[in-house]
Amino acid sequence: MEIKEEHKEICGSIATCQENNRSFTLKNATDFIKVKIDGAVFPNGDKTVRCDYLFFNEKEQERIIEIFVELKGKDVEKAIKQLEQSIEMFAQSNRRYAFAVATNVSTQFNTLIQKKTKEFKQKKHTDLKVRSKAVQCNYHTDTNTLSISQ
């Protein structure tokens, strides 16, 4: 699915998105574009299942890395489904990450998270990370990879 220019925001050295005490921060984000999917690409009220944000960088109109982000309350399973759908609609790069940032990640979801993490890697070629409340990542330009700050 094509993303209109009006929905793209050029990032500075630090890019963030936040919602109801949940946040995602990307450091060294100078070459990234931030897209608000839920509420912009798909207006509020649209029933399409989708994640909240997509970050990507590109070189010569080709995406190098994509980061899908869902900021969710408690329903981790729904967050994962939203990420899956968004990857199917928007993925263009072979290097992808997906983050579900929930209010509280219960230990009852450990088995589901492990299963989905493995499934994402095999079927979607995407690294899935599920975290509580806040995530900070660093982008490494030399390897086009992310590391999660602890």
Say what each PLM segment does.
Residues 45-46, 64, 75-83, 109-113:
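Active-site-adjacent loop/helix micro-motif of nuclease/hydrolase catalytic cores
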